[in-house]
């Protein structure tokens, strides 16, 4: 009698993990850009916002507005159907994000006066190839010294790349 096959990871569970790593990559990049991460995966009855970040107070001579970014992260494989996730930000999705952001601001009135923007981060994820690149070994969290747009980072058999970060991607 053949021995039972080793359990295979659930596809949905694997996709969630890949999505979390994509979000973590964007958090690392935002931190490098002098943003402070306030919340991750904040959810309410209307939906979920992947990342909520506040710009650090500006230096003298810079724009004086501290901003609050509600960031939607789309992690996709190459050759996907939806322009690396950009087409998934439909008007309906934008409306859900808007309502979710409004509820977040109600729960955090100290942030309500900040300039708010809706940003979109597009992350590409593929199974690792043999191409030379920075390899990152992770336990639970993605820890990278530098994340750059269009620079691959290898994590647990996957290659991630922040393709684009679109500030103020949409307004309502």
UniProtKB/Swiss-Prot annotation:
Database matches in CDD domains: PoNe_Nuclease (cd20736)
InterPro entries noted in UniProt: Restrct_endonuc-II-like, tRNA_endonuc-like_dom_sf, UPF0102_YraN-like
Cysteines paired by S-S bonds: none
Gene3D superfamilies: 3.40.1350.10
UniProt xrefs under Pfam families: UPF0102
Superkingdom classification of source: Bacteria
GO molecular function annotations of the record: nucleic acid binding
Family note: Belongs to the UPF0102 family.
Record's protein name: UPF0102 protein AM1_3954
């Amino acid at each position: 009698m053949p021995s039972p096959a080793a359990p295979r990871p659930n596809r949905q569970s694997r996709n969630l993990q890949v999505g979390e790593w994509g979000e973590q990559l964007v958090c690392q990049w935002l931190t490098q850009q002098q943003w402070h991460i306030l919340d991750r995966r904040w959810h309410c009855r209307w939906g979920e916002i992947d990342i909520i970040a506040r710009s650090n107070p500006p230096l003298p001579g810079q724009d004086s507005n501290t901003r609050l970014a509600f960031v939607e992260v789309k992690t996709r494989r190459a050759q996907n159907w939806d322009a690396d996730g950009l087409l998934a930000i439909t008007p309906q999705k934008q409306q859900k994000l808007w309502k979710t952001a409004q509820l977040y601001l109600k729960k955090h009135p100290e942030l309500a006066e900040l300039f708010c923007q809706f940003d979109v981060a597009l992350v590409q994820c593929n199974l690792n190839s043999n191409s030379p690149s920075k390899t990152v070994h992770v336990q639970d969290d993605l820890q990278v010294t530098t994340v750059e747009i269009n620079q691959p980072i290898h994590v647990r058999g996957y290659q991630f790349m922040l393709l684009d970060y679109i500030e103020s991607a949409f307004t309502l």
